[in-house]
UniProtKB/Swiss-Prot annotation:
Mg(2+) 2 binds at D21, D147. It comes from Polaromonas naphthalenivorans (strain CJ2). This is Ribonuclease H. The keyword Coiled coil does not apply. It is found in: Cytoplasm. The gene is rnhA. InterPro entries: RNase_H, RNaseH-like_sf, RNaseH_domain, RNaseH_sf, RNaseHI.
Amino acid sequence: MTDSAAEPTISQPQHVVIYTDGACKGNPGPGGWGALLASGGTEKEIFGGEMGTTNNRMEMTAVIEALAALKKPCTVTLYLDSQYVLKGITEWIHGWKARGWRTAAKAPVKNVDLWQRLDALLVSSGHSIDWRWVRGHNGDPGNERADALANKGVERALGRL
C-alpha cells in the first residue's frame, strides 16, 4: 500500500517538527505522499505512493505515516498545506464521530478509512500536536521538501524509482 524510505526511525524526541504534503497526477490518479521530520538536528525523510488515489488521500497518508514514524509520545509541530486535513482534524472530526462518521448533511464522510486511522493514531500515540497551516508552493523550505518527497512518491507509484 505505502512505501517509505529505509532510514532509521526517530526514537524518542522531545519535540519534532514535521512537514507533510501529498501529490496526485490526475485526481484520481497515481499519487504520492512525503514527510520531513526534524528533531534535535536529526532529519528523516519518508515518502510513498499509490495508484488510483486522490490528492486528499495522499495529504492524509503523509500525516498518518509521519506520526506513525514517531515511536514514543512527543510534542509535534506539524506543518501542512492542506486545509482539508487541517479543518478535518481540528474542526470537523468531532461532529463526524458524534454523527456516526456522517457529515452535517448526513452523507458518509469521504476517506473515512483514513480519518478513522488518523483518529485512532492520535488517541493511541500520546502525541501533543500543534497543527499549523502553511501556504503551499510559496517558498517555505520545509513545505518545498515535503512536496518534492510527495512527487518522489508519485514516481515510485509509477515504478520509476
